Swiss-Prot record:
Cofactor detail note: Binds 1 [2Fe-2S] cluster per subunit.
UniProt GO BP: 3-phenylpropionate catabolic process
Subunit structure: This dioxygenase system consists of four proteins: the two subunits of the hydroxylase component (HcaE and HcaF), a ferredoxin (HcaC) and a ferredoxin reductase (HcaD).
Gene: hcaC
Species for this entry: Photorhabdus laumondii subsp. laumondii (strain DSM 15139 / CIP 105565 / TT01)
Name of protein: 3-phenylpropionate/cinnamic acid dioxygenase ferredoxin subunit
Length: 105
C-alpha cells in the first residue's frame, strides 16, 4: 500500500469534489469535515462520480442516471445501480490529503 498525495485541505472546501487521475480514476469528496474516496466511475454507467451531486448523510448522486451511493461504504443506495463503488482510505496529515492505494492497481 502507498499513499497518493492529492491536495491540501485548503484546496478542497467542504462540499467539494475532485477527480484524481489514477488507474482507475478516484473521486475525492469533502463532506462535513470528513474526506471520502471512491472509484470515479459509476458502477451502473460510464459517468464520473466526481461530477455528481453531494447529498446529505455523505451520499453522492450519479450525474447520469441518478443512482446514489454511500461515500462511507460505497454501497449503491438506489436503482439503477446495484453494485457498490470501491472505497479508498483517506489520510489527512499536516494539512495534506492522501489516498491509500494498492501498489498493484
Amino acid at each position: 500500500m502507498s499513499q497518493l498525495f492529492v491536495c491540501t485541505v485548503e484546496e478542497l472546501p467542504d462540499g467539494g469534489a475532485r477527480k484524481v487521475e489514477y488507474t482507475p480514476d478516484i473521486a475525492l469528496f469533502h463532506y462535513d469535515g470528513e474526506f471520502f474516496a471512491v472509484d470515479d466511475r459509476c458502477s451502473h454507467g460510464n459517468a464520473s462520480i466526481s461530477e455528481g451531486y453531494l447529498e446529505d448523510n455523505a451520499t453522492v448522486e450519479c450525474p447520469l442516471h441518478t443512482a446514489s451511493f454511500c461515500l462511507r461504504t460505497g454501497k449503491a443506495l438506489c436503482l439503477p445501480a446495484t453494485d457498490p463503488l470501491k472505497t479508498y482510505p483517506v489520510v489527512v496529515k499536516d494539512g495534506n490529503i492522501y489516498i491509500t492505494v494498492s501498489e498493484e492497481q
